[in-house]
Amino acid sequence: RPPGFSPFR
């Protein structure tokens, strides 16, 4: 996952 990836967004 790239930095800034939000699994909740």
Swiss-Prot record:
What family is this?
Belongs to the bradykinin-related peptide family.
Q: Which UniProt keywords apply?
A: Amphibian defense peptide, G-protein coupled receptor impairing toxin, Hydroxylation, Secreted, Toxin, Vasoactive, Vasodilator
Main location as per UniProt: secreted
Enumerate the GO terms in the molecular function aspect. toxin activity
The role this protein plays is:
Produces in vitro relaxation of rat arterial smooth muscle and constriction of intestinal smooth muscle. May target bradykinin receptors (BDKRB).
Q: Could you tell me which residues carry 4-hydroxyproline?
A: P3
The cellular component terms of Gene Ontology attached to this UniProt record, alphabetical and capped at eight, are:
extracellular region
Any one Gene Ontology BP term = vasodilation
As annotated in Swiss-Prot or TrEMBL, what is the tissue specificity of this protein? Expressed by the skin glands.
Source organism of the structure: Pithecopus hypochondrialis (Orange-legged leaf frog)
Cellular compartments annotated: Secreted
What is the protein's name according to its record?
Bradykinin
